[in-house]
Design a protein with these regions (language model features):
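Walker A/P-loop NTP-binding motif of AAA+ ATPase domains
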Residues: 1-181, 185, 197
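AAA+ ATPase "lid" subdomain C-terminal helix
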Residues: 180-207
Length: 207
């Protein structure tokens, strides 16, 4: 984060300011949440883009939307643009691919090359890094790449504490026991369990 918030200091030492990073890993592990918290800590404006936000994905016009997105981010800089499920937005350019998709990827590459000079940082998240166009992962683009694993036992315990924090509970909750019983569960699974339990309790109380 320091390299983004103290750009001039790092440039003085000849450090190349990164333009973006890729967060990849299994579904439900909090990649978008991490992106938002990263932005919050840096004090940047946060812009979340999902595949459905680019309605021109299979018709002409998608590249113009990408260009306008980066212009808007620059006008409100410092900004973080988070492309959620980036594999669906910027897939590999292969023979026979829709020309509008190829044009959109080309526009993205042109825009991200200039991000650090415009007060913009790009974060891309995906469950399928192998489907992303290779050019996006080269130096000067999404060069920072981090694997976000499923939560371990201690992380699951902390997630239960987080989601149960403001819930009404008639008994003391054994967070460690819950963690032990939810091996291989991801963050979204734990959130669902807590919400389901709260809903069931509320329904019983109504009756």
């Amino acid at each position: 984060i320091d390299v983004l918030t103290k750009v001039e200091h790092f440039k003085k030492y000849g450090v190349t300011i990164p333009n973006g990073m890729l967060l990849y890993g299994p579904p439900g592990c909090g990649k978008s949440y991490i992106s938002e918290k990263f932005c919050e800590e840096a004090g940047f404006n946060f812009i979340l883009i999902k595949p459905s936000d680019l309605s021109s994905i299979y018709v002409s016009g998608g590249e113009e939307k990408i260009g306008q997105l980066f212009t808007d981010a620059e006008n409100n800089s410092p900004s973080v643009i988070c492309f959620d499920e980036v594999d669906a937005i910027m897939p590999k350019r292969t023979e026979g691919i829709n020309q509008s998709v190829s044009a959109r990827v080309n526009e993205f590459l042109a825009q991200i090359n200039k991000c650090s000079d415009r007060g913009i940082f790009v974060i891309a998240t995906t469950n399928k890094p192998d489907l992303i166009d290779d050019a996006m992962l080269r130096s000067g683009r999404l060069e920072l790449q981090f694997y976000i694993p499923p939560p371990d036992e201690n992380a699951r315990k902390e997630l239960f504490k987080l989601h149960l924090k403001n819930r009404y509970c008639e008994i003391d909750i054994n967070h460690e026991k819950l963690s032990n019983k939810t091996k291989n569960y991801v963050a979204s699974d734990i959130e669902f369990i807590v919400n389901k339990a709260a809903h069931k309790s509320a329904m019983l109380d109504v009756r």
